[in-house]
């Protein structure tokens, strides 16, 4: 049993963080153009890109909140991740050919090709705001872990994380983002496996006792027969699994940008297949980890302190129960989760700002060297903004008292942010790929009605967060197409 963080734990964590910055320094010597900074010269290995896509979507939310969710409730949310391979199939055969057929850097260039520059600008802005909300949450979670470990102010921990990620992303561009994602994925998954092994070792009866306790308390239940629109029903989770995951895989620059870093369309398909197939074993691992934590504290009730919320149960176990040295490795794994998402967001926001705004609307003939310098400065600015927003999220979720303020915590907030801001935008991408008659007027009306409906549902009816993306995509897609059919504006081709 470990009563706290020791010198060896700090050394392990420092070596990991230093290694990530070292990779940034190494790749900084090669980042001499925007083509390399944004796309890795379109020559990245498909398997590394696939792991990077997986890591980008993984985040510390998966590492902390999903085990916490399984600990608190059951496996109902496993269905959500099982829908990702279905989304991968849709994107590979329908969206990817449309994107790869165009020699583009930003996915929002596709929107201009179909609907004009105004829609492109809207899509890019919506992406930026959605990512800022997302990075605030994924930066908050690992900083919470450091708060638990060291007792230092939470805001200081957020600052440390924000600075380190910003530094290596500024230095190395998309290449360092992809290769650090590979390293971070290995560390993160290895850490989860190690934690699960040690939990089972500490329980009399081991793995089979975890199964027994989990079954006795219905922890493996995946289907809830209920009619409430606010519960974790399989109906809402199944619907949300398809539509919510369609948002990042079809319309989010952090993911779609990876498709453009590969050498060919074949490699793009292979990287996407790899990224979605890894989801299945990793999801089973993280949900079982949460059930194992429940079994551990059921058999060792005296070790659980009062007031430890579901979002903090895994970090609490790491700090209190992991052997010296291994605790540092597990904390490094949590850092890997957040850094793999945060670096992707910083680089992609920089890509969008330069490609979709600076070069498109302000200085189209600006030299590549100036654009590269601007991209780095934007990365710094976005890193500062993300850090400030993470402080605000921490104060909100912690309720100002150091305790988690909600039963569902950061995971549900993340889903709500993605559904509310991304659903309507993804619907417009669907209209661009699946129809030819949709035009600018239809897009505008569809986006307005979609946003209005989502706001009403979110603040007026308190429906399940999993319904947000589905409603946003369907309303945006259907309304934009129907309005276009009765309008006289000729769509862009």
Please annotate each region the language model reported.
Residues 1-493:
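Membrane-embedded helix-loop-helix hairpins and adjacent transmembrane boundary segments
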């Amino acid at each position: 049993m470990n009563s706290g963080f020791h010198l060896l734990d700090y050394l392990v964590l420092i070596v990991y963080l230093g290694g990530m910055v070292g990779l940034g320094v190494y790749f900084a010597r090669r980042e001499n153009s925007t083509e390399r900074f944004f796309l890795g010269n379109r020559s990245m290995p498909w398997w590394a890109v696939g792991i990077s896509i997986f890591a980008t979507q993984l985040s510390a939310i998966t590492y902390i909140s999903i085990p916490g969710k399984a600990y608190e409730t059951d496996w109902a949310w496993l269905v959500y991740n099982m829908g990702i391979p279905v989304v991968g199939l849709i994107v590979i055969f329908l969206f990817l050919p449309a994107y790869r057929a165009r020699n583009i850097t930003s996915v929002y260039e596709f929107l201009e090709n179909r609907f004009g520059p105004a829609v492109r600008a809207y899509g890019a802005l919506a992406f930026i705001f959605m990512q800022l909300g997302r990075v605030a949450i994924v930066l908050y979670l690992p900083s919470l872990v450091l708060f638990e470990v060291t007792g230092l102010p939470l805001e200081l921990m957020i600052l440390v994380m924000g600075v380190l990620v910003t530094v290596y992303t500024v230095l190395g561009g998309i290449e360092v983002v992809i290769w650090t994602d590979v390293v971070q994925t290995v560390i993160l998954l290895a850490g989860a496996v190690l934690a699960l092994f040690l939990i089972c070792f500490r329980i009399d009866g081991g793995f089979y006792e975890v199964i027994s306790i989990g079954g006795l308390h219905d922890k493996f239940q995946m289907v809830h027969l209920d009619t409430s629109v606010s519960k974790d029903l399989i109906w809402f989770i199944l619907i949300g699994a398809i539509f919510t995951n369609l948002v990042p895989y079809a319309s989010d620059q952090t993911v779609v940008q990876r498709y453009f870093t590969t050498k060919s369309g074949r490699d793009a398909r292979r990287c996407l297949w790899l990224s979605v197939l890894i989801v299945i074993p990793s999801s089973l691992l993280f949900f079982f980890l949460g059930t194992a934590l429940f079994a551990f504290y059921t058999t060792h009730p005296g070790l659980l302190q009062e007031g430890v919320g579901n979002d903090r149960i895994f970090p609490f176990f790491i700090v209190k129960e992991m052997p010296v040295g291994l605790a540092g490795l597990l904390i490094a794994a949590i850092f890997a989760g957040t850094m793999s998402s945060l670096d992707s967001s910083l680089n992609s926001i920089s890509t969008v700002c330069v490609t979709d705004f600076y070069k498109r609307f302000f200085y189209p003939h600006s030299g590549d060297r100036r654009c590269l310098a601007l991209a780095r400065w934007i990365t710094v600015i976005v890193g500062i903004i993300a850090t400030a927003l993470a402080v605000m999220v921490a104060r909100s979720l912690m309720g100002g008292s150091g305790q988690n303020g909600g039963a569902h915590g950061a995971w549900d907030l993340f889903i709500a942010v993605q559904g509310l801001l991304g659903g309507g935008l993804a619907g417009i991408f669907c209209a661009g790929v699946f129809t030819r008659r949709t035009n600018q007027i239809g897009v505008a009306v569809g986006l307005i009605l979609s946003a209005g409906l989502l706001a009403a549902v979110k603040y007026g009816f308190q429906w399940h967060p999993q319904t947000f993306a589905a409603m946003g995509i369907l309303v945006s897609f259907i309304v934009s197409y129907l309005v276009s059919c009765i309008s006289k504006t000729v769509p862009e081709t």
